[in-house]
């Protein structure tokens, strides 16, 4: 019984520990989502948790939105073949 409980807890942690994280990126131009209030940031948290992003938490780090718990399908900075502000 205890073994089953431990195995179940491990499976739950695998999804949390191995989830993707990174800077949220605009697909149109390859730029990061800007922010100015470092640390806990409602704008970044809302953007990261949006249905099209699927993240679990977001905050402002180095003046850009950093997201945790993203699905593998969500692109993060840098995007291949798109460099922000460069042609």
Swiss-Prot record:
Disulfide bonds join 31-84, 35-60, 44-65, 48-67. Residues 20-85 form the LCN-type CS-alpha/beta domain. Expressed by the venom gland. It is found in: Secreted. SUPFAM superfamilies: Scorpion toxin-like (SSF57095). Pfam families: Toxin_3. GO terms for cellular component: extracellular region. The modification Cysteine amide is found at residue 84. Residues 1-19 form the signal peptide. GO terms for biological process: defense response. The keyword Metal-binding does not apply. Keywords: Amidation, Disulfide bond, Ion channel impairing toxin, Neurotoxin, Secreted, Signal, Toxin, Voltage-gated sodium channel impairing toxin. GO terms for molecular function: sodium channel inhibitor activity; toxin activity. Belongs to the long (4 C-C) scorpion toxin superfamily. Sodium channel inhibitor family. Beta subfamily. Has the structural arrangement of an alpha-helix connected to antiparallel beta-sheets by disulfide bonds (CS-alpha/beta). Beta toxins bind voltage-independently at site-4 of sodium channels (Nav) and shift the voltage of activation toward more negative potentials thereby affecting sodium channel activation and promoting spontaneous and repetitive firing. Induces immediate paralysis in crickets after injection, with a total paralysis occurring within 15-30 minutes and lasting for 1-2 hours. Is also lethal to vertebrate (chicks) when injected in very high dosages (more than 100 mg/kg). This is Toxin CsEv1. It comes from Centruroides sculpturatus.
């Amino acid at each position: 019984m205890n073994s089953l409980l431990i195995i179940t807890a491990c499976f739950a942690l695998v999804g949390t520990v191995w989830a993707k994280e990174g800077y949220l990126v605009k697909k149109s131009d390859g730029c990061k989502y800007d922010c100015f209030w470092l640390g806990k940031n409602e704008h970044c948290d809302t953007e990261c948790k949006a249905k099209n992003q699927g993240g679990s938490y977001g905050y402002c780090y180095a003046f850009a939105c950093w997201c945790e718990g993203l699905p593998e399908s969500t692109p993060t900075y840098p995007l291949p073949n798109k460099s922000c502000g460069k042609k």
